Amino acid sequence: METWKTNLDETKKRYIDWWNHKGIILNMWEHFQEGVKPHADIPAPSPAKDLNQKWFDPQWRAEYLDWYVAHSSLKADILPVANTQLGPGSLAAILGGVFEGGEDTIWIHPDPDFNDEIVFNPEHPNWILHKELLKACKAKANGHYYVGMPDLMEGLDVLAALKGTDKVLLDTVMQPEVLEQQMQQINDIYFKVFDELYDIIREGDEMAFCYFSSWAPGKMSKLQSDISTMISEDDYRRFVQPFIREQCQKIDYTLYHLDGVGAMHHQIGRAHV
């Protein structure tokens, strides 16, 4: 790679230290552009015709992200990463959830035909969209920046997006054995999806993640369980912890996004997943 970030090697060293629990990373969630000298003469695309083009047109997004990264600050440990997110928890859309583009985000609504079967359809348009978006961005990047892994998410959060949060919470009581089986099915599909997307975006063994603009020398992912604010510690240990543990065992570099103080009671006193 010949990226637009002149101090990338230094940042990589700091990331490797950070993954080994040493030092800090001076980064930010997104990029800023005020006062930035462009890294390349990349023109902005024509404004999106509508929200569908803004989010779900791979070529338009690739052109926009190419312009965006070229005009963004890459100082300190800010990484050159194209944010390819298709909404938080887009694995749910791959499994049948319904996309809706908003002004500032992408919403994923439950599958109206969901019947408790977790099925991966390799011909599903939302899965094809993920791959086409990443391929378009990778071609446009031309080695100048990383193409970030979308925020697939996992486990109960994916099922809640696919089925509805209230129904998943009832399942912890009404059909816990079925729920456990669904968690394993989602995990199995997660690894298949993750590996295929990783092979599209990887730079050697390296990759970047779209959220947190984070980097690792191998496979990495951000893990979380937002719904955990609404379940007991026993349910967390049964329906969340085993499957996050499996992700940590199979993915080289992982970080846990503790989204809200309500989820902290699952972590206090537990140093290891």
Task: List where the protein language model places each region.
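Active-site loop segments of alpha/beta catalytic cores
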Residues: M1-L51, A62-E63, Y68, S72-T84, ...
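A contiguous, low-structure linker/loop signature
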Residues: V81-D116
